[in-house]
């Protein structure tokens, strides 16, 4: 899905390359990382809790575009005085079913942890609506930027390139930027996500293993998603097609990443899309969904009377997906930790601005299957949304 590295660690913190300023270094001693870790652990953000311990000073003084970076004096002055920082967060939209709820919960819990390290407040500049709009996201960021209301920024991009310009613009003003959820190619200090093509391969391996253990001989596959054109969706589809084609002799795909079924992110439209696809493609035996819609594929399968004959796999957590796993129609829900992605930004900002360290990209998919059981995932989801 992208060509850039996931963990950047490529920034000079000040002229020394080791500390942001002497004033900040002196103030940094009071940061309560242990307290932050406890809060992250309380919320089951275990990868982030580990990431705090893995944070380290950058290995290079160069950003992705070859420039160097120095934190703005206005920010270091705030830190030296113990003033509250403005942490800005921009994700796809505030009304995307299931996704937005988990991102909002995550950023809120992330701020809770980050405050143990540095005083800060949340400024959520994400646009309204139920689909991701790049221009609206950028406009929201610029509105805060132009009024001096950003001291650190985290972005959940649509793809690997659409936010490169705004990232460079914000960084040029001495404001740290982090990205989450999608591989990206800007000047951001670090990124917290997975590699989409590898995710697709992992999904294929899970399905192949499930087929072997359950004596399933499925041959006809299809791929789908809310926005198949997105680079992360393309990677997940491409990896899945490659993995299944290699591991299942005689496998046939009714479509690929080039023409994946577009379901939208609207629940009713997604269900209708799957019902129509299944009715129009009676030979299909397995449908990959690359985001949150697999529960609707499972529902469409059940409504068509094809339970036990057609199966699905999807990403992220929802009660509907967990129910579909328990029912045996969905093979797995690949949890990419939306809430942890949202929580990464404030914690990464606090660690960087307090100690001059960059948190590693240690995120990994956590598959939920019938074998692993759904009970823990249900508790986690309930905790996130509480």
Task: State the predicted function of each range.
Residues 33-40, 45-46, 61-80, 84-110, ...:
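Extracytoplasmic "Venus flytrap"
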Residues 2-12:
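Bacterial N-terminal signal peptides that target proteins for export
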Residues 87-89, 93-97, 101, 107-112, ...:
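An alpha-beta-alpha
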Residues 29-85, 244, 337-386:
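Hinge/cleft segment of the Venus flytrap/periplasmic-binding protein
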Residues 139-172, 240, 258-324:
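Hydrophobic alpha-helical
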Residues 160-198, 318-331:
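Flexible loop/hinge segments that line or gate small-molecule binding clefts
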Residues 67, 71-74, 137, 191-220, ...:
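Hydrophobic alpha-helical segments within soluble ligand-binding/sensing domains
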Residues 19-27:
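C-terminal segment of classical bacterial N-terminal signal peptides
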């Amino acid at each position: 899905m992208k060509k850039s590295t996931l963990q950047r660690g490529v920034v000079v913190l000040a002229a020394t390359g080791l500390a942001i300023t002497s004033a900040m270094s002196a103030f940094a001693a009071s940061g309560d990382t242990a307290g932050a870790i406890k809060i992250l652990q309380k919320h089951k953000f275990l990868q982030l809790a580990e990431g705090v311990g893995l944070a380290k000073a950058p290995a290079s003084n160069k950003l992705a575009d070859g420039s160097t970076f120095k934190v703005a004096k206005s920010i270091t002055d705030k830190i030296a005085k113990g003033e509250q920082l403005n942490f800005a967060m921009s994700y796809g939209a505030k009304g995307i079913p299931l996704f937005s709820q988990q991102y909002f919960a995550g950023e809120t819990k992330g701020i809770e942890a980050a405050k143990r390290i540095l005083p800060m407040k949340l400024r959520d500049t994400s646009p309204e609506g139920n689909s991701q709009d790049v221009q609206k996201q950028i406009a929201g960021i610029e509105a805060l930027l132009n009024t001096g209301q950003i001291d650190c920024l985290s972005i959940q991009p649509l793809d690997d390139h659409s936010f490169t310009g705004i990232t460079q613009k914000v960084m040029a003003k001495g404001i740290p930027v982090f990205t989450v959820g999608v591989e990206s190619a800007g000047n951001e200090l670090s990124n917290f996500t997975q590699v989409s093509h590898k995710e697709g391969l992992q999904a294929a391996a899970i399905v192949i293993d499930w087929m072997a253990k359950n004596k399933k001989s499925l041959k006809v596959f299809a791929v789908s998603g809310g926005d198949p054109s997105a680079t992360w969706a393309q990677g997940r589809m491409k990896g899945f097609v490659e993995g299944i084609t290699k591991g299942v002799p005689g496998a046939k795909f009714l479509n690929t990443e080039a023409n994946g079924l577009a379901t939208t992110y609207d629940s009713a439209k997604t269900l209708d899309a799957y019902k129509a696809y299944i009715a129009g493609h009676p030979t299909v035996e397995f449908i990959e969904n690359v985001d949150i819609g697999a529960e609707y594929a499972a529902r469409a399968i059940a409504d068509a009377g094809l339970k036990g004959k057609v199966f699905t796999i999807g990403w992220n957590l929802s009660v509907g997906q967990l129910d579909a796993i328990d029912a045996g129609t969905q093979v797995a829900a690949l949890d990419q930790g939306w809430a942890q992605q949202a929580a990464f930004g404030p914690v990464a900002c606090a660690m960087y601005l307090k100690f001059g360290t960059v948190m590693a990209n240690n995120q990994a998919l956590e598959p939920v299957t019938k074998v692993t059981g759904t009970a823990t995932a249900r508790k986690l989801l309930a905790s996130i949304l509480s």
